[in-house]
From Swiss-Prot:
This is Glycine cleavage system H protein. The modification N6-lipoyllysine is found at residue 65. Binds 1 lipoyl cofactor covalently. InterPro entries: 2-oxoA_DH_lipoyl-BS, Biotin_lipoyl, GCV_H, GCV_H/Fam206, GCV_H_sub, Single_hybrid_motif. Residues 24-106 form the Lipoyl-binding domain. The lineage of its organism: Bacteria, Bacillati, Cyanobacteriota, Cyanophyceae, Oscillatoriophycideae. NCBIfam families: gcvH, PRK01202.1. Its cofactor is (R)-lipoate. It comes from Rippkaea orientalis (strain PCC 8801 / RF-1) (Cyanothece sp. (strain PCC 8801)). The gene is gcvH. The glycine cleavage system is composed of four proteins: P, T, L and H. It comes from the Bacteria. GO terms for biological process: glycine decarboxylation via glycine cleavage system. Belongs to the GcvH family.
Amino acid sequence: MDLEYPDDLRYLDSHEYVRLDGEIATIGLSAFAIEQLGDIVHLELPEVGEALEKGESFGAIESVKAAEDLYPPVSGTVIDRNEEMIENPDQLADDPYGDGWLIKVRVSNLDAELDDTLSASEYQAQLEGDDD
């Protein structure tokens, strides 16, 4: 299966992505991570209004294979969470970069937040290196 990595996103080593629209960051999980997890059975996300700190776990995802913590690529305040994905986490694989987003965050310090994220091509190169 050919996985997509949209160029308008930034990625973390831990496979979360971020799409910025002004000071609003949409955060989700890459198609690679979703494929590796397999059948997703549970998704735990923060409440609206919760403050997130970059690098600190904000939730968890559980599949029949594994359970993994989720990490925000940016710090800020949760302004929305995807209730549909919480109720139907198995649908994350259908559209991870569209309807399968996880949370939306108002970024607290936009200038410094994306320094350690990867472009789509850098992320793909890292994944291909992991196969060796």
